[in-house]
Structure formats: C-alpha cells, structure tokens
Amino acid sequence: MNITVCGTGYVGLVAAVVFASKGHRAIGLDIDECKISLLRGGASPLFEPGLEELMAKSSCNLEFTADYRKAYESADVIFVAVPTPEKADGSAELSYVMQACDQIAESRERGCIVVVKSTVPPGTNDRIQAYFDDIA
C-alpha cells in the first residue's frame, strides 16, 4: 500500500517509519526543507528511542519530500498529522489541516482515504468530508 503522512513531527514521523517497516511504501511530507534534508540523510530531528535504526532498516520503503504533489499523487491512504496550535481564545487553529486538504484535493485525480491524526475538535471530520464532497 502507498501511504503518505503529512507532517513529520512526533506523530507523523513515527507513523511513516512504522508503516515502512511493515512493508508499505511510505512517504513523509513536510514543508520544512531542512528537516527533509536531515531525514533523507537518515537522521531524526527528534528523540525517539530506536527510530533512526528503524528508519535505516526501512529505507527501501521510506521516502521524505517537501513536494506535496509528488507525495499525494499515488497515495492510497493519506494521514494528516500537522500541528493544531491553540488560538488566543482557546480554540484549535485548523488552518494547517485545511491547507493539507486543499493540497490533497489539488493533487488527486482519484479518490483515496484521508485520515486526520491531528488533534481536532468534534465536527472537524464532518467539515472535511463536506469539503471533499463539494469538490468531487
């Protein structure tokens, strides 16, 4: 299965590496070119015991890119694991999630499964489903 994980923080990076270790073709997508360069070199920008070793063992199934079109075009499943920081009023900032959805829609000619792993408030997945339904 071709899996893209949008966001290579603690949630996204670990997920992408584990998917690759299980034999799936996994792409880790991030807007941070420096982080992508580090990951392509086999180094992790965060501390997670055993992660770099698992990255090395899974390197034949694991790729990192900042090019969202490339990352999304052949994905069977896309995991969105981007930040949802708290706004001043305490609500979640969902612009990164919605930006990922915009890029997915722009890059896809056929459907795929989109899984939101980011922490989002109730109703967000309904909003995302309606968004994709409207553009289909």
Where are these regions (language model features)?
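Conserved N-terminal Rossmann-fold NAD(P) cofactor-binding segment
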Residues: 2, 25, 31-77, 83-91, ...
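Glycine-rich Rossmann-fold phosphate-binding loop(s) that bind the pyrophosphate
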Residues: 8-9
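Gly/Ala-rich phosphate-binding loop of Rossmann-like dinucleotide-binding domains
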Residues: 16, 20-21
